């Protein structure tokens, strides 16, 4: 098999591969131009310049010209100023989901919220509304919808006043999809939505279980389902038709069913490769090398939408295809069955980072992937037939129930290791080392190839080891949206003051626990509740059932409270009528600074505290009640005189926190303040008892 470095002269597959890599890397670099993440594509660029340079000037130019071209365009788009104000915008819809769609006017892309939208990709609309920068409530360690949109090139959102359709696509599948799903109970509906339409409703039990055990990406992989369906059709047709006839029939089926997978990059890749098969059959030309076809498919998708370069599905899908291509020579001397098994193991190895779910590495996820993949094919095929004909309610309900019960059983035996999330640089290093190892292996430099393999293992293993845990001291104001959760850590002693709480999802499972694992904390010595408000302690039951919590404290009588070397003093010793007046106000002398955590204590409590404690000061003040004007009176702020105030608050919250009056007061007093809705989790940390830096 011809590889890039073995190509004599400038073969067409080598040419396309270098052009594709240059375009994709250039687009990523331009988009990340003003961020620290530019270091990742920068390192790849340096290595590829070296490789291309070693091959000769032509290779260097073929890589550099597309790179610079792509970098220039994406850089300009990234630097475009944000639009604001009331506007009338026309554009084409390029993506639709259950409750929003993305529209492009040719230069900019806009997010538009629309409850239960039935719009289709390809519709052209005219929208009147107020344009502003993207702004969504974000949570620590949880999926960032805003980051996802920005990777798609979306920087603005439109608060719609009116929408007028200019052109509507004749085939209206979205409406049919909704009508079809309404025939089923919620559990079956969620399963069909996942396996056929690749939409993940995390409130659905099946979806949540699949995510927990680590096989959600496979079950929702529409490209995999699409390819599996076509492979099944290919097998059936091969019994009746000749090879070339089979390819044409399968391609017709692929074209017929692709509307079900619009917006799914994996499905597009499969369709393009199938179209190549038909082209070679009809033109009677010799089939081009796989590398040529794969690179050409990547280029077609890139030019259809350059922002695919930032899509995990695009990068992982083509990265996996290139990996399998270059990795095939490693199994050359094995027998057929051994070769298939080793290729499967190799595939699972490539997908290892995907098996880390919420900071837990799922040991059996590769096995579950192998088990459920055939089921995904069968269920998706039945769902597709049902969608195209009549609803098979009883059959699909039975299959959905079987899958759900299987997932419940497997969840009980699922083995996992709490490693914490893999940092971005670790995942990058893992994949970068894989391709370097393959490159060196093909060159015959097995020594360097082994070093690459060692780097791969270290990139995921070393950051997961809690070697620094005994030497870390930190206070983290965790971004739990509109609520409070504060981690105090002194080496191996960890205390959580409040844990937040929201009604829409399990905050402990999706925010608190993943954050603790990311910090290499696997038990809490104490959970303290400042008071009983749900936004402070609503996640407590879930947290204590899923994570090791040694002690739970909520009573004032337990203070002063000493946990390890940490001593908390409560200053709210007064009797209050409402729940906020009962909130603990805790002081902690730690890391050479005095912290004051005020919970939701109001002005009345603040005034009593400074009256009875005239010498009370603090370096870092957690502002009361999320910046509400019911707290943070002038007298309290003047006496406490903090170096910095921290406001734990959710973005775009319905209460208007922090209140403008409070912000004005802080500015008038010259007090610096930081907000979790703007910065995310705010952490003060030091190692080996070194002095704490700037606050």
Could you describe each region identified by the protein language model?
Residues 526-528, 532-560, 642:
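Active-site HxH/HxHxD metal-binding segment of metal-dependent hydrolases
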Residues 226-227, 263-269, 309, 532-538, ...:
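Active-site environment of divalent metal-dependent phosphoester hydrolases
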Residues 2-9, 67-217, 509-519, 523, ...:
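Membrane-interface helix/helix-cap signal primarily in integral membrane proteins
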Residues 18, 22-24, 28-37, 44-45, ...:
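Hydrophobic alpha-helical transmembrane segments in multi-pass membrane proteins
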Residues 608-680:
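Cap/insert and terminal regions of metallo-dependent hydrolase folds
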Residues 306-309, 411, 418-526, 556-620, ...:
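Core dinuclear metal-dependent hydrolase active-site scaffold
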Residues 356-376, 383-431:
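Membrane-interface amphipathic/re-entrant loop segments adjacent to transmembrane helices
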Residues 4, 153-273, 278-282, 568, ...:
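Aromatic-rich juxtamembrane segments at the membrane interface
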